[in-house]
Structures are given as structure tokens and as C-alpha cells.
Amino acid sequence: MRHLFLALALASVSYFAHSQESFQLTEKSILGLTLTSAPQWDQIEAAFNEAKAQSLEVGDQFRPELFGEAAHNETKEKAIIQFAPVWSPQQNTQLGVRQAFRGGLSASAAFGTDQRSASTPNGRFERISTSSIRVDLQVDLWRDLFGRLSKAQSQSAEFDLKRAEIEREIQQKTFTLGLRRTYWSMVANNEQIKVYEGLKKIALEQLADARKRRAAGVTDDGEVARYEAQVASREGSRLYYLYQRELLMKQLKVLLPELQSKEVALAPYDIPKMIQTVLACTATIASQSSVPMEFTKFDEVTALLRQTQRERTKLASAYDDVDLKFVGGVRTTGVASEGDGNGNYTGSYDDAFRDWQQNDRTGFSAGLRFTMPLGREKTRETKELYESKRFDAKVKERESEIATTHQQLVKVIALLADVVRSQKENSLALERRLAVQNRKFREARVSVNDLILDQDAYLNSNLVTIQTQLEIINTIFDYLVVFTETPCEFNRI
């Protein structure tokens, strides 16, 4: 029964493993996935939409809005004197529209009604009704004269949105480059595993040969043990790189959840072709004697930062400005209050409307509203300094990144290319030496320790070559993060 259960469990695991859809991993197949399902992609979109929402909020200040209110008040309080009646019930309504404009102007228009009743010792007021139309105007005469501040606020939001659009493109490019980094790390890891598998195979062959020679009495247990240790060492290193591969696979599946249900495996790749593509791209980069501004969008970001800084400084400078406004309004009213000669008055909404149409009760108001802040100079100066410093820091950071990335990475790539050439020459020399050492070992002219030392030197040289090639690729990726429009094949994948 126990064996049956184990067999069923193994069959279930095997079925699950085979039921997973396979996915052949290449640069193009990664980028062909639905990148929009990636969490990091969502974060990029969220950051952009946050900037977009902030820009729209600024624009919403200058959109019309409808407002209104309705109220009913009632009390059982009695009038003490006839000249001061207690109005109950009272009903008030108002409906209107208002809008602020970018020129420092705001206006509103509203229609309202009022109906109330009251009683006094000398009579009764029943449904006394009033209807009114009011138009109000407010003009900024100083602080926002001709829309100086409202325009600065709108333009600042517009520049922020344009910058967010460009930064979204840059971040999306950075994300895809990050996926490609992971892919090439997996390729390098696979090459490292191949190196250790090859050396492990050689070590196993040498171990088998040593055991034969021990059986023939040619060698002793010490040499066999040395080869056994070498096999274990090679296997341990191979398992370590297999562990690294699983970590890279986990990293890739975290970046692309679409791969979580798939059995992912590296598709065949062409390293010589990749090297030629990389070298062609490095040649394009190295051919630029000066910083190729046409290859980057960072300069557009810095220009927009400067424009935003200018508008934000205007807003900060107005913090303690005098606030002087003209306020005016026009109102026309209709009243319904018909007396019967006995101290009783009645009215209705209809009568109020008719009175409004038949009698001109138009009135107007005009005035100035003045506010002068006192003691806010230090706050204004601090705000101005804050806007100046924070934008200066962002601009300098971008400008430095543009210049340094081109100047230094060109040198770094050249140095790494020299390292690869040197390592290849070193590997070829070590390969020739290893062949000689193997022959000498078979002739009993060198010790097993000397042979293993030469094998380790050859191994390390190959590993360094692989790692350096990966460094070149990552360095180019660093360059393409800034110079996203570099015209080379490696950047068009």
C-alpha cells in the first residue's frame, strides 16, 4: 500500500510537471509577452496617472460648476411685538453656476426663491414669496492680475505632465532593458554551468583512470582521493550555478507573472552573433566624439524641469503679495405680498414671478476687497529657495548623468573589450598548456596537483571571460537607459 501511494504521488508530480506549458526563452520572446501585466509596468503607469491627475486637478479649477441649496425652517416661537414677526415656516432655494477663469476673473449666476409665513397680533402673512436672479463678478487687480499666477499654475501642471509622459517612456525602456539584463545573466549562467559540466566530465574520466591505475598498483589512494575531491568540487560549483539559475528564474517570473504557470527553458542562442551585435553597438557609441543629445530624451526632461522651476518660482514669490480684488454684482427681484386691507398678506411663487416680469427691481453693488499679509517675508524667501534648490538638483543630476554616462561608459566598454581579448588569449594559452600537462601527467612527468592547478587556471580564465562579456552587455544597457534612441541593432530588439 505504501509503495502504491508513493507511485501515485510521483505520477501526480510528473503529470503536473508535464501539464505546464513550455516557454522557450529568448530576448524577443520575453519582450513579446504581455508586459502590461507586469507589476513594475503597473507602477510606471500609476506614477504617470498620478501626474496626469494632478494636472487635471489644476485644470478643474477653471471648469464651471453647478451649485445649489434648499432649506426648510420652522419654529413655534411667538412674536412679542407686531413689528418683529417670527417667520415660520421658511423655505429657501437657490440654483446657479459659477466659474473661475485663468485671467484672474471669476463669475457666478444664480436663481433663488424665498417663501415664508408669519402671524402678528394685527394680521397674518401667508406664503410671502420672493424670486431673484443674481450675477456676481470678481476681478483680481494685483496678485493674479491678467492671470499671472493662474497661468503659472496651469503651465507648471502642463510641463509636469509632459515630463511625466517622457519619464514614462524612459522607465518603460528601462524595464525592458532590465528584462534583457536578466536574460543575458541567464545565458552567462548557462555558459558557466557548461564550463563546470565539462570539467566535471574530465574529472570523472581522470578519477576512473586513477582507480584503474590504483588497481594495477601504479598509484595509491592519495591520488584517487585527490580526484574524488576534484569531482566533488566540480559538482559543488555546478550545483551552485544551478542554484543561481533558479534565483534568476525566480527574478524573471516576479517581473513577468505571465511566466509563473510555464516551464521556462533557454532557447538555443548564438553567442558569436551576439558578440558581433554588441561590438557594432559599441562602435556606434564610440564614434560619438561629443555627447549625442539626439540619442537621449533626458535633455527634454531637463528643459521641462527648468520651465517648471520658472513657473513654481512665480507662485512662491507671490506668497506674501497684496490681494486686491474688485467685487460687483447685479440683482433683480420679484416680490409677492398682496394685502386684503385688514392686515393680512398672501403671496405665491407665481405672483413673485409675475412681479419680477412686470416691475423693475434691479440693483447693483460694487466694491474693493483688500488684504495685505504681514510678517511672511521669511516664509516667501524659504519657498523661493526651496523651489530653486530642488529643481537645480534635479537638473544637475540629469545633466551630469547624460555627460558622465557617455564619457565614462565609452572608456569602460573599451577597457572591458580589452579584458575580453586578453582573457581569450589567456584561455587559448592555458588550453595549450593543459594539453601539454595532460600528456606529461600520463608520462608521470608532473604531479596530479600540478595538473589540477592548470585545470583550475583554465577554468577561472573561462569564467572571467564569460563574466566580462556579461559586464560589457550590462554596461551597454546602462548606456541605453540614458541614451534610449541610440541607433544600433542591439537597441532595436
Where is each model-derived feature located?
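Periplasmic alpha-helical coiled-coil/stalk elements that build and connect Gram-negative outer-membrane
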Residues: 25, 159, 165-293, 412, ...
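N-terminal signal peptide c-region/cleavage motif recognized by signal peptidases
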Residues: 12-14
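Sec/SRP-type N-terminal targeting helices
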Residues: 42-46, 59, 102-127, 142-167, ...
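Amphipathic alpha-helical coiled-coil segments
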Residues: 41-58, 171-198, 205-207, 230-231, ...
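Acidic, low-complexity, intrinsically disordered peripheral segments
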Residues: 6, 18, 76, 240, ...
